[in-house]
A protein has these predicted regions:
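Extended, low-hydrophobicity segments enriched in charged/polar residues
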Residues: 2-191, 201
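Long, positively charged binding patches that form subdomain-scale interaction surfaces
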Residues: 154-263
Length: 277
């Protein structure tokens, strides 16, 4: 079952102005501009750009990942692309790995697939026996119980370039700072929400990251089936990580239906990999 709605369209000028104003409250240096998209193949992506017929999709959710009755659920994002009229597309985003493709392991998935040329640049990260992070190529065209995917024709067009340096505010997450900047400065009301997606690099500095361990290694109850959400921490954290990281992000300021779509509560999903190793 697929439920659909439309996000409100704002001009790139309004979006960039909102980001410039809002992000300046959290970072020492902020430069937001509208530019021609660089050739993303130079960034190791399987497509040149991220423009044309843009759609985002929120697949599954926490119950499909953590409810014992639903663990192991898998979704074919190539089949989903056909259902939404994006079968010839570049798909990027963040999700969980399909356990059937990982010998039963859990994994954090960077979705990076060209469904036009069949090129795959996806990466999976999982927790090893000694709690080390293992990152490797992933070529399956399906993901696990949740995924946030951006579908586009993959052509080059105008994009918003954001350059930031030096955090001065309390918000530690760039994507959450972006969501707040958009909400505050676009003065969103009446469910006139906006969604953005794209690729960014961490050139300097380090970040805190996590990978979901295998279910058998989580020794406590962390999911409440009545609330249909996780109520205790269960992730394996790694810090500091970086720099030279490439991130793939889908974010939105809210549900354009007012809540009927039951979108991911965080309002964003971002996964990354090293671009030098």
């Amino acid at each position: 079952k697929i439920e659909k709605s439309k996000f409100k369209e704002y001009s790139l000028d309004r979006i960039s102005d909102a980001l410039q104003s809002g992000l300046s409250n959290n970072y020492k240096l902020v430069e937001v501009s509208i530019v021609d998209c660089p050739n993303l193949r130079d960034w190791g992506c399987p497509s040149e750009g991220i423009s044309g017929n843009q759609k985002i999709i929120d697949v599954g959710g926490e119950p499909y990942m953590h409810d014992p009755k639903l663990i192991g659920a898998e979704f074919d994002y190539e089949e989903i692309s056909k259902m939404i009229g994006s079968e010839k597309s570049y798909a990027l985003g963040a999700g969980s790995g399909a356990m059937s493709c990982l010998d039963g392991h859990c994994g954090e998935l960077v979705i990076n697939e060209n469904l036009i040329t069949d090129e795959s640049k996806s990466i999976i990260a999982r927790v090893g026996k000694n709690k080390e992070c293992i990152a490797e190529k992933y070529t399956a065209r399906k993901h696990g119980g949740l995924g946030n995917v951006f579908y586009t024709d993959g052509v080059r067009g105008k994009v918003i370039k954001i350059k930031i340096k030096g955090r001065s505010g309390e918000q530690g997450s760039l994507t959450q700072a972006m969501r707040k900047a958009l909400s505050d400065n676009l003065k969103i009301k009446d469910n006139g929400h906006i969604a953005l997606a794209g690729v960014f690099r961490i050139l300097n500095g380090k970040i805190r990251s996590h990978v979901q361990p295998d279910y058998k290694d989580i020794k406590h109850e962390y999911y409440d089936p009545e609330q249909m959400k996780c109520v205790k921490d269960f992730l394996q954290f790694y810090e500091p990580v970086g720099p030279e990281l490439q991130s793939y992000c889908v974010l939105w300021t809210g549900d354009p239906t007012g809540g009927n779509l039951n979108l991911r509560e965080s309002g964003e999903h971002t996964h990354f990999h090293s671009y030098t190793k």
